[in-house]
């Protein structure tokens, strides 16, 4: 299972320099039987990004993309974990993404993000990360 935060989902909804490589990488992962997920937070943030920056018709495209993902709920235990997970420099919404991914830790093969703080948090908790197309 691949977890995608909002920085990754945005690249699938709005063309950015990493979009092509991310799509290619996801296609390869899908060919190996990998499913993808985000959290309820990722769903909300993605729809807000499209509302703010998207072109006509992108709302429907975003809904189609999100319908193809497993949407992980933000339960009380997830929110509780978000209060303490990762380094102190991790921002609140990033901590929620990290805690949401922890729900699927056993199945998690990669956490896809382009956020440097979140990458650091992922590594601190032992998640494998991917940022296809990113220059590091």
Curated annotation (Swiss-Prot):
Cofactor(s) listed in the protein's UniProt record: Mg(2+)
GO molecular function terms listed in the Swiss-Prot or TrEMBL record: magnesium ion binding; RNA nuclease activity
Primary enzyme class: hydrolase
InterPro entries membership: PIN-like_dom_sf, PIN_dom, VapC_family
Pfam families for this protein: PIN
The family this protein is said to belong to: Belongs to the PINc/VapC protein family.
Protein's name in the database: Ribonuclease VapC47
Species name: Mycobacterium tuberculosis (strain ATCC 25618 / H37Rv)
């Amino acid at each position: 299972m691949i977890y995608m935060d909002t920085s990754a989902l945005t690249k699938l909804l709005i063309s950015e320099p990493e979009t092509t490589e991310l799509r290619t990488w996801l296609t390869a992962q899908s060919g190996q039987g990998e499913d993808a997920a985000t959290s309820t937070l990722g769903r909300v943030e993605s729809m807000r990004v499209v509302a703010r920056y998207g072109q006509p018709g992108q709302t429907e495209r975003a809904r189609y993309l999100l319908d193809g993902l497993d949407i992980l709920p933000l339960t009380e235990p997830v929110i509780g974990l978000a209060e303490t997970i990762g380094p102190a420099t991790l921002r609140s919404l990033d901590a929620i993404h990290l805690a949401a991914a922890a729900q699927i830790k056993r199945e998690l093969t990669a956490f896809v993000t382009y956020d440097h703080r979140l990458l650091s948090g992922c590594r601190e908790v032992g998640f494998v990360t991917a940022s296809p197309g990113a220059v590091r």
